[in-house]
């Protein structure tokens, strides 16, 4: 709105300083900031330190193969993905045209997942988002443990776990989102993104 631009309350109500207490109540209501909770957070949280040789971020085809190769070479490996299931875009690209090593993509994926789950030095974390990548390969990740469950099933279980990861090597295999090229008549019938063709 032209009368109330974003952040107006930081500039407009700075003077006189002793009036701030009176302004604040109305400003918070108009800005939609709501009330701060007065009770303690009922949820449980935890943190864990993880040291590994190789951290693989993303569990699509590339991430699975990178983690499998590292673990089979005797390296302590951690594979993380923000989705609940391993496989990345392969999960929804299942078709007769999308083959990996002359196999249907879903059967290939199932075989690979079963194989990597048997590797002793590979730890897999799904529903885990890497949020920060600091120097010397120190990363922070948040593992969602119960957010996907119905409220009545959560009980007194831990909601989130903060993972503090120190890795010797980090492989980023987060995939991509295909961006369309913009050109004249790109919206005509028969013009598709390559992912739509598969």
What are these model-predicted stretches?
Residues 84-108, 181-185:
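Conserved N-terminal glycine-rich FAD pyrophosphate-binding loop of Rossmann-like flavoproteins
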Residues 73, 95-96, 187-190:
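Glycine-rich, phosphate-binding/catalytic loops in enzymes
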Residues 2-57, 112-198:
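FAD-binding core/adjacent interface of flavoenzyme oxidoreductases
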Residues 62, 84-85, 177:
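Conserved Rossmann-like nucleotide-cofactor binding loop
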Residues 67-68, 87, 195-198:
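Histidine-anchored nucleotide/phosphate-binding helix
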């Amino acid at each position: 709105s032209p009368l109330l631009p974003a952040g107006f309350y930081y500039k407009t109500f700075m003077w006189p300083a002793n009036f701030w207490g009176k302004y604040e109540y109305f400003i918070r209501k108009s800005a939609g900031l709501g009330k701060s909770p007065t009770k303690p957070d009922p949820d449980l949280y935890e943190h864990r330190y993880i040291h590994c040789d190789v951290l693989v971020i993303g569990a699509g085809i590339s991430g699975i193969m990178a983690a499998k190769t590292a673990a089979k070479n005797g390296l302590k490996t951690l594979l993380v993905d923000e989705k609940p299931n391993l496989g990345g875009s392969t999960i929804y690209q299942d078709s007769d045209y999308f083959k990996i090593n002359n196999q249907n993509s879903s059967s290939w994926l199932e075989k690979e997942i079963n194989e990597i789950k048997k590797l002793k030095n590979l730890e897999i974390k799904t529903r885990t988002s890497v949020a920060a990548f600091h120097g010397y390969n120190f990363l922070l990740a948040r593992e969602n443990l119960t957010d996907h469950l119905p409220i009545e099933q959560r009980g007194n279980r831990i909601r989130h776990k903060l993972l503090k990861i120190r890795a010797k090597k980090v492989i980023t295999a987060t995939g991509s989102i295909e961006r369309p090229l913009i050109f004249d008549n790109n919206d005509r019938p028969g013009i598709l993104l390559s992912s739509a063709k598969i």
